[in-house]
Structures are given as C-alpha cells and as structure tokens.
Amino acid sequence: MNPAPLTRRERIFARDHNRCVYCNAAPPAHELTLDHVEPRVKGGDQSDGNLVTACKTCNELKAGSPAWAFLAGDAERRENFLLNASGVWPRIRRAILEAAEKRVRPAG
C-alpha cells in the first residue's frame, strides 16, 4: 500500500527542510506557516514557486509586503532567504537581489 500523498503544506515544508526561509529557525511543525513570497493582494499566485515556509514571527513581520521589500533592509534574513528558498521563482530571487543593490548603491 502506498502512503498518502503529501499535502501542499507538507510538500513545501519538506522542500524547505522544515525551516523558516527568512530566519532559519526550525520551530515545531505547528508553529510553521506558509508564506506567499509575492502576496496574493499584490498579484502573487498560489503556485509552489510563490510559497515558502516561514515561522509565525517572520510571517507576521512580513505581513502583506512583497519579499523584496521585507528583505531589502535586512541582510541576515535576505541571505537566509537566498540560501534556503531554492524553490521560489527565479524572477523573485532577482527582484530581491536588485532591491538590495539599490539600497547599498551610493547616490549620485
């Protein structure tokens, strides 16, 4: 008998190694949440490429912000995301890198 297929939530958590992609914490599974990297209210979809594992704290801090805005001023979380969120769409990763570059580039 084959085991039951994983739910989307279980699949995303497993892909992200049951860790928050933002802070790298590994809380108990009941404290993990799914986060829309690009919020649905801002055009993000329900695809696996737009979903990541987040702890409750990071999900609440990010709220309805797109990941590039949330991560632009937080080098540690940004680095964690780029290392841990291998399943997100490449365009999202590019947007995060571009936003970070704009913050550190001197004016002029």
Describe these PLM feature segments.
Residues 3, 30, 40-41:
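Short, solvent-exposed loop/turn segments at secondary-structure junctions
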Residues 1-22, 79-104:
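Short, charged surface segments at domain edges that flank catalytic/cofactor-binding sites
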